[in-house]
UniProtKB/Swiss-Prot annotation:
Residues 20-272 form the Deacetylase sirtuin-type domain. The keyword Amino-acid biosynthesis does not apply. This is NAD-dependent protein deacylase. Zn(2+) binds at C155, C174. It catalyses: N(6)-acetyl-L-lysyl-[protein] + NAD(+) + H2O = 2''-O-acetyl-ADP-D-ribose + nicotinamide + L-lysyl-[protein]; N(6)-succinyl-L-lysyl-[protein] + NAD(+) + H2O = 2''-O-succinyl-ADP-D-ribose + nicotinamide + L-lysyl-[protein]; N(6)-(2-hydroxyisobutanoyl)-L-lysyl-[protein] + NAD(+) + H2O = 2''-O-(2-hydroxyisobutanoyl)-ADP-D-ribose + nicotinamide + L-lysyl-[protein].
């Protein structure tokens, strides 16, 4: 007879197997892929700020990055929001307005990844650290925003997420709860858990090819994805302006502007399919 602990362990293992199967189907087999499509590789792409820099989105870690104007602790932590929500909302309102300027458009790198998804279908997954919507505007649909999305807000009490394109003020409240609660940016701040991690790690365990684009290799857990992918046998590729902090982990590397190296690599990959 199983002990209570044994029952819990058995139930945990069954639930884990079920989760793995659900995620596997969600990521790569949503439309019951036909047999000939099975020959196509499962490709997992990670993008960082470098892919959007050429579209005019300022990066966080560059010399002229956003943190020049504000301390990280003031605008990108839960504690900063608690201290001065108006400052935090003003900061993200400016970023939101910038993103919606007509000159901010997907560049050739974004468009190349949309083309890659078109070729691979549900055997393609894009994970981005960026909070802009340039991947979606380029045509990508299978996207996980692990650090949140700038054009969304969420209830600070229930966590309910809402689409939001305008400014947010301290007077704006979410009415999904019994008592109206303040809205906060739908952005993962320092000290908070990134979004979609179960799905991401499942995809890493199944990927045939892992490609990192425009990432610094400074921020974990994303900086550790290449190691995780290698453990499961994936071929790893870095496409970056310069070698990242984890550049030596990659089997294949190409350096230059994202708008140049990403389309070139995608064309090379598509020719091999």
């Amino acid at each position: 007879m199983l002990s209570r602990r044994g029952h819990r362990l058995s139930r945990f293992r069954k639930n884990k197997r079920r989760l793995r199967e659900r995620l596997r189907q969600r990521i790569f087999f949503r439309d019951k892929v036909v047999p000939e499509a099975m020959e196509k590789p499962r490709v997992l792409v990670l993008t960082g700020a470098g892919i959007s820099a050429e579209s005019g989105i300022r990066t966080f870690r560059a010399a002229d990055g956003l943190w020049e104007e504000h301390r990280v602790e003031d605008v990108a932590t839960p504690e900063g929001f608690d201290r001065d929500p108006e400052l935090v909302q003003t900061f993200y309102n400016a970023r939101r307005r910038q993103l919606q300027q007509p000159e901010i458009q997907p560049n050739a790198a974004h468009l190349a990844l949309a083309k890659l998804q078109d070729a691979l279908g549900d055997r393609f997954l894009l994970v981005t650290q960026n909070i802009d919507n340039l991947h979606e505007r380029a045509g990508n649909t299978n996207v996980i925003h692990m650090h949140g999305e700038l054009l969304k807000v969420r209830c600070s009490q229930s966590g309910q997420v809402l689409d939001w394109t305008g400014d947010v003020t301290p007077e704006d409240k979410c009415h999904c709860c019994q008592f109206p609660a303040p809205l906060r940016p739908h952005v993962v701040w320092f000290g908070e858990m990134p979004l979609g991690m179960d799905e991401i790690y499942m995809a890493l365990s199944m990927a045939d090819i892992f490609i990192a684009i425009g990432t610094s290799g400074h921020v974990y857990p994303a900086a550790g994805f290449v190691h995780e992918a290698k453990l499961h046998g994936a071929h790893t590729v870095e496409l970056n302006l310069e070698p990242s902090q984890v550049g030596n982990e990659f089997a294949e590397k190409y350096y230059g502007p994202a708008s140049q190296v990403v389309p070139e690599f995608v064309e090379k990959l598509l020719k091999g399919l």
